[in-house]
């Protein structure tokens, strides 16, 4: 009797398990069939928000939030496009709702999806992610980059810090009121004390490399010129009144020596040719001289050449007078 009851209980348990398995399998098959035939109750998000053959599921997910649907299908039909012909008659007439007073989509007091709103709400009382009047970038308006604005600077409190510390008592690397670039400001210059030094020493008694009041560029100013004594007794490289460019003054020298009346290009003018004495030289002297004389003779017969020579002579005379005047002015200055 006991064996029969045990066998019956085992059979009952086995049948129950088999029924549950079949029921679960049937539900799965039914669900798959519904998904295949698009008969399930889930909103078909993959079809797109505005699919015509899908009814919005107000009772599921975020669609139950009325704020989500606010402005989407209400009176201003923004989904028609910004430049739809709807409302153009009123848009272009002057008056309160004229084109010069309207916003992006119509009236002057509306924003993108409603009246005077910002990105996610009404414009007049929100900022980027909340209310404008009391928030900053990530919170309230009275804060700075990483905290409250009125009591912080870049990395701390603004009113009592500078770049890396307190503002009112530091400079770039220390205290501002008593330092310069690398030390105290009121009693130093660039590399020392300001009131008693110049660039490399004391200011009131030095020049560039020494004392200012008694030196020139490289020595004493009142008694030297560029490289030595002052201009009244030297020229460019020596005494001015008795030298020329490289030696004695112009009245007794030429370009490289004595003046033009007794030298040529590289020596005496009246007794040399191009590379030597003119009257006794050959291929580069006599022949050239002969050609030059022949060419000069033929040119002299041309009236235009004579006019040009007169002009050149006048120009040379004017140039010579100007040079002499400049030399006289330099002599007077010295």
Curated annotation (Swiss-Prot):
It holds the Pfam family FARP. It comes from the Eukaryota. Belongs to the FARP (FMRFamide related peptide) family. The keyword GTP-binding does not apply. This is Antho-RFamide neuropeptides. Residues 27-116, 122-125, 131-134, 140-142, 148-151, 157-160, 166-169, 175-178, 184-187, 193-196, 202-205, 211-214, 220-223, 229-233, 239-242, 248-252, 258-262, 268-271, 277-280, 286-334 form a propeptide. GO terms for biological process: neuropeptide signaling pathway. The modification Phenylalanine amide is found at residues 120, 129, 138, 146, 155, 164, 173, 182, 191, 200, 209, 218, 227, 237, 246, 256, 266, 275, 284. Neurons associated with smooth muscle fibers. It is found in: Secreted. GO terms for cellular component: extracellular region. Keywords: Amidation, Neuropeptide, Repeat, Secreted, Signal. It comes from Calliactis parasitica (Sea anemone). Not known but it could act as a transmitter at neuromuscular synapses. The keyword Signal applies. Residues 1-26 form the signal peptide. Residues 115-289, 303-334 have a biased composition (Basic and acidic residues). Residues 115-334 are annotated as: Disordered.
